[in-house]
Swiss-Prot record:
It comes from Aspergillus niger (strain ATCC MYA-4892 / CBS 513.88 / FGSC A1513). This is C6 finger domain transcription factor adaR. Keywords: DNA-binding, Metal-binding, Nucleus, Transcription, Transcription regulation, Zinc. InterPro entries: Sec_Metabolite_Reg (IPR050613), Transcription_factor_dom_fun (IPR007219), Zn2-C6_fun-type_DNA-bd_sf (IPR036864), Zn2Cys6_DnaBD (IPR001138). The gene is adaR. The keyword Disulfide bond does not apply.
Length: 777
C-alpha cells in the first residue's frame, strides 16, 4: 500500500538540491512573465529594483494536500450570529479565511434584515452597533478578532444604503477570486499576503493616469516625495494647513490631523503607511503650499513656491493613484482628492479641475454622502456632511466657471442636514452623540456653514430651471401642489428671488452672532467674507445668470440699482486683497467678475455723473486687480467693454477729468462708502494663531460696527450707506424714475448688448457667485 504523507508535510520531497528561481516580486504582482534575469527585463524597463525569489515551487491542483484537523471542530455558531472563529491546528491562509467569513457575514446580515426582527435579535444587533468601528474611529482593540472587525464593517456598509449590498457582495467575491487565482497561478506565486498587507497595498493601476493624474514613472515620483515625507516639513505644512486652509475648506477633524502630522500618533484607526493616509498627508501638504505666498515659502523652506507646488502636486497625484481613487470605498481617499482639487484650482486655470470635479461628485454619490444612514456615529456624520457640502460648493463654483449646469441638483444638495455649528474640539471619534448641537459665536465651522448656505441659494437664484422639486425652503403660493407648479411660482412670482436672498441673510447673520472681528484674523475674514456673500446674493437676486422667465426685464432709464448693488461686492473683494489681515486667506478670494462686468456695463450706460464719479476708481482698480490675477491683459468682450468705457471718459462731452480721479489704491486706504461704519483698523490680530480660534461668549459686536447683535434683514441696512439705500431692494421697484439730463435713448438696448456679449466662460474661468479659488496667490 502506498504510504500517505503526513499532515505536517505539504510539499513533495525534493529531487534536487538546487533551489529554483521564480518570478521576481514586481512581475509576480503584475502577473506578467518574468525572464528571471538579474535584474529582469521588466524591472529594468520600469526603473525599479528587481527582487528575485528563490524557493521551492508550491504544489497545485490535485497534487496539493489539504491540512487535516487534529483537534475537534469548533462548536456550531448560535442562531443569528454572523461571525465564526475557526482555530485550526495548522497554519491556513488567513486572508482567504477572512474573506470567506466576511462574505458569509455580509450574506447572513442581509438575510437577517429581510425578515422580521425579534426584540432579542434587535438588542443583539444594537450591541454590535455600539461596538462598531469605522475608518474615523479609534484604533481597534488588539484582542479583538480581525474577522469580527471585518464582518462588522461589512455589515455597516450594507446598512448604509439599500442598494449597497450588491456592490459589497461583488467586491468581496472579486477579492476572493483574486486570492484563489493568485495562489494557483503559474507556479511562481509565493505565500499569499496577509490581510494587513493586502489593505496597505491596493492596486496602484486603476486607470488613474488616463485622467492626467499620477506619474508615468512611479519610482521617480516616490523619490520626489521624499522632502514631503520629512517629519519636520510635514509638521510645518500641517500647521500652515490648519491656519490657512482648514478654516475655509472644512472637511477634516483638526485634533485628529494635529495628533497625526504634528505629534506623530496614528491617524484614527488606520495602520501606519496605509495608502489612504499617505494620500491624505500628501494632499494636506499640497493644499498648504498652494495657500502660501512666495514670501512664506522663501522664509519657511528657502525655496520658490512654483518649485514646491510642482513637487507637491506630483507627490499628491502619485499617492492618490496608489490609493485607488477610481475604485475607492474609503472616504479618506475622497477627502484627499477634494483637497487636491482645491489646491490645483488655485494654480491651474485649465478646465481640468472642472472635469475632475465630476469625478468627486460621482464618488461622493457612490459613497452615499448625501444620505443619512441610521447607523453611524456622530463623528462619521459630521465628517460625511462636511465633505458632501464642500463637494456641492465646488460643483456650483465649477458650473459658474464653465457656463454649465451643476451636476448636483437642488434636492441632492439639501437631502442631508447641515453640519453642526460647533468646534472640532467638541467631539472625537468616540463621541456617541452631541448633547449641545450648536454653539453661539465664532466656531471652526462658521465660515464654512455660511458658504454651505450660499451654495444652495446660488443654485436657486442662478439655476432655477435645473431642478423643479425643491422650492428653496420658502413657502410659495403654489409650492405645495406639484413640481410643475413650484417651477411656475418661481417664474411668475417677482418676489421669490428676494425671499431667497432674505432667507440667506437671516441664516448668515445668525451664524455671525457674537462674532467679534477684532479677536483674530479668522474672525475678521469671516465677518467681512459673510458681508460680501450677502451683497453678492442681493446682486444675484436682482440680476441672476439665468433668468427665470423668457427674457430679462427691460432696464429703466435712470435706474442705478444694479450699479449700487455691485459696489459693495467689489469693495469687499478689494478689501480682502489689500488688508494684511486677509493674507492667510487671500488664496481663496478672487475679484468677482460677474459684479465687475455688470458694474462696467452700468457705468457705460449710466448718466448719473455723481455715482459714476464715485464708483469709477473702485471699478477700475478691480479691473486691474483682475488682470493681475490672470497674469495677462483681458481681451474679448470684457476688454472691449473696458476700452469703450475709457473712450467714453476721454470724450469731451463725458465726465469732467477733474471729477474722475486716477485710481490710487493702497492697503492703507481701501475704498469706503459714505456712512458705512468699519471695524477698527488696528492690526493687533493679524498674527493671531490659526490652530485654535478664540470663541468669545457673551460678548456683543463693537459699537463702531453699527450692527446689532442679531437682527434679521434690517441688520444689513445699518451696513448700507445712506446714499445707496434703495427701497426696491427687497420689494416692488419704485414707481418714479430719476431721468437724468442727457440720457442715452438707446441705453436699454446698449446695456443688454454689452452685457449679453460677455460670456462668462470666456472672461472668467471658475469664479464666484461668492468667494472662489483664486488663480494665484
Amino acid at each position: 500500500m502506498e504510504q500517505r504523507s503526513s499532515p505536517a508535510r505539504s510539499l513533495p520531497p525534493r529531487k534536487t538540491t538546487t533551489t529554483p528561481q521564480l518570478s521576481c516580486e514586481l512581475c509576480r504582482k503584475r502577473k506578467v512573465k518574468c525572464d528571471k534575469l538579474t535584474p529582469c527585463t521588466n524591472c529594468a524597463a520600469s526603473g525599479t529594483v528587481c527582487v528575485p525569489i528563490y524557493r521551492t515551487r508550491l504544489p497545485r491542483g490535485r497534487h496539493a494536500t489539504r491540512p487535516r484537523r487534529v483537534s475537534s471542530p469548533p462548536p456550531t455558531s448560535a442562531p443569528g450570529e454572523t461571525d465564526r472563529i475557526i482555530q485550526p491546528s495548522v497554519p491556513v491562509n488567513e486572508d482567504l479565511q477572512e474573506r470567506i467569513y466576511r462574505l458569509e457575514a455580509l450574506i447572513q446580515g442581509m438575510n437577517s434584515h429581510s425578515h422580521t426582527r425579534t426584540p432579542s435579535a434587535t438588542s443583539r444587533e444594537q450591541s454590535v452597533q455600539l461596538s462598531d468601528t469605522s475608518t474615523f474611529q479609534t484604533a481597534p482593540n488588539p484582542n479583538t478578532s480581525p474577522i469580527l472587525n471585518s464582518s462588522i464593517v461589512s455589515k455597516r456598509l450594507m446598512l448604509q444604503r439599500p442598494d449597497q449590498f450588491w456592490a459589497d457582495l461583488v467586491d468581496e467575491i472579486h477579492g476572493l477570486r483574486e486570492v484563489v487565482e493568485s495562489s494557483l497561478a503559474g507556479g511562481q506565486e509565493g505565500p499569499i499576503p496577509s490581510s494587513d498587507s493586502a489593505k496597505s497595498e491596493p492596486p496602484n493601476d486603476d486607470g488613474i493616469q488616463v485622467l492626467g493624474l499620477g506619474a508615468s514613472n512611479p519610482s521617480a515620483a516616490l523619490r520626489s516625495m521624499s522632502p514631503l515625507h520629512n517629519p519636520v516639513v510635514a509638521r510645518q505644512l500641517c500647521e500652515v494647513y490648519l491656519q490657512q486652509v482648514d478654516p475655509v475648506i472644512k472637511i477634516l477633524h483638526r485634533p485628529s490631523l494635529n495628533r497625526w502630522m504634528v505629534q506623530g500618533e496614528p491617524y484614527l484607526s488606520y495602520a501606519d503607511g496605509h495608502p489612504a493616509v499617505e494620500a491624505l498627508g500628501s494632499a494636506v501638504c499640497y493644499s498648504a503650499i498652494s495657500s502660501m505666498t512666495d514670501n512664506q515659502c522663501s522664509v519657511m523652506f528657502h525655496a520658490n513656491k512654483a518649485d514646491l507646488l510642482a513637487e507637491a502636486r506630483v507627490a499628491c497625484e502619485t499617492a492618490i493613484g496608489r490609493a485607488g481613487l477610481l475604485t475607492t470605498r474609503d472616504i479618506t481617499v475622497l477627502q484627499a482628492f477634494v483637497l487636491y482639487l482645491v489646491a490645483r484650482r488655485s494654480e491651474d486655470r485649465t478646465p481640468a479641475v472642472w472635469t475632475l470635479i465630476a469625478l468627486a461628485v460621482r464618488i461622493g454619490k457612490g459613497l452615499g454622502l448625501y444620505l443619512d444612514p441610521e447607523t453611524e456615529t456622530f463623528f462619521d456624520q459630521q465628517i460625511r456632511r462636511r465633505l458632501w457640502f464642500t463637494i456641492c460648493l465646488m460643483d456650483l463654483q465649477a458650473s459658474f466657471g464653465q457656463a454649465s449646469e451643476p451636476l448636483i441638483s437642488v434636492d441632492e444638495s439639501a437631502s442631508t442636514a447641515l453640519p453642526q455649528h460647533i468646534n472640532d474640539s467638541d467631539f472625537d471619534p468616540t463621541t456617541a452623540a452631541h448633547s449641545d448641537p450648536n454653539r453661539e459665536g465664532l466656531t471652526d465651522t462658521t465660515f464654512a456653514l455660511v458658504t454651505y448656505h450660499a451654495q444652495r441659494t446660488g443654485r436657486l437664484l442662478n439655476f432655477v430651471q435645473h431642478d423643479r422639486k425643491v422650492d428653496g425652503g420658502i413657502p410659495t403660493p403654489t409650492s405645495s401642489t406639484s413640481g410643475t407648479s413650484t417651477s411656475r411660482s418661481r417664474t411668475c412670482d417677482p418676489s421669490w428671488p428676494q425671499q431667497q436672498a432674505r432667507h440667506f441673510e437671516q441664516e448668515a447673520l445668525r451664524l455671525l452672532h457674537f462674532c467679534d472681528p477684532g479677536t483674530s484674523a479668522y474672525a475678521w475674514f469671516t465677518w467681512h467674507g459673510t458681508q460680501s456673500l450677502i451683497a453678492t446674493v442681493r446682486l444675484a437676486a436682482a440680476r441672476p445668470l439665468q433668468w427665470h422667465g423668457q427674457a430679462p426685464p427691460p432696464r429703466r432709464e435712470g435706474n442705478t440699482e444694479l450699479l449700487r448693488l455691485c459696489l459693495p461686492v467689489l469693495e469687499k473683494a478689494q478689501l480682502m486683497h489689500t488688508d494684511p489681515r486677509a493674507e492667510g486667506f487671500r488664496w481663496y478670494v478672487t475679484i468677482p467678475w460677474y459684479a465687475l462686468a455688470m458694474a462696467l456695463a452700468e457705468c457705460y450706460v449710466s448718466s448719473d455723473t455723481a455715482l459714476v464719479r464715485y464708483a469709477w476708481p473702485l471699478v477700475e482698480s478691480s479691473y486691474l486687480q483682475y488682470e493681475a490675477t490672470l497674469g495677462q491683459s483681458l481681451g474679448g468682450p470684457f476688454g472691449q467693454l473696458m476700452r469703450r468705457m475709457k473712450e467714453k471718459l476721454a470724450a469731451p462731452a463725458a465726465l469732467p477729468p477733474s471729477s474722475l480721479p486716477s485710481t490710487n489704491w493702497s492697503p492703507a486706504t481701501p475704498p469706503t462708502f459714505p456712512g458705512v461704519p468699519r471695524p477698527q483698523s488696528s492690526h493687533d490680530d493679524r498674527h493671531a494663531p490659526g490652530c485654535s480660534w478664540p470663541v468669545p461668549t457673551g460678548s456683543t459686536p463693537p459699537a463702531d460696527l453699527g450692527v446689532p447683535s442679531l437682527l434679521p434683514v434690517s441688520t444689513w441696512e445699518a451696513l448700507s450707506p445712506p446714499s445707496l439705500d434703495n427701497p426696491s431692494l427687497f420689494g416692488v421697484p419704485p414707481t418714479t424714475t430719476a431721468v437724468a439730463d442727457g440720457m442715452d435713448p438707446g441705453a436699454d438696448i446698449m446695456w443688454e448688448e454689452l452685457f449679453s456679449g460677455i460670456p462668462f466662460n470666456e472672461i472668467a474661468g471658475p469664479d464666484t457667485f461668492f468667494f472662489d479659488m483664486n488663480w494665484g496667490s
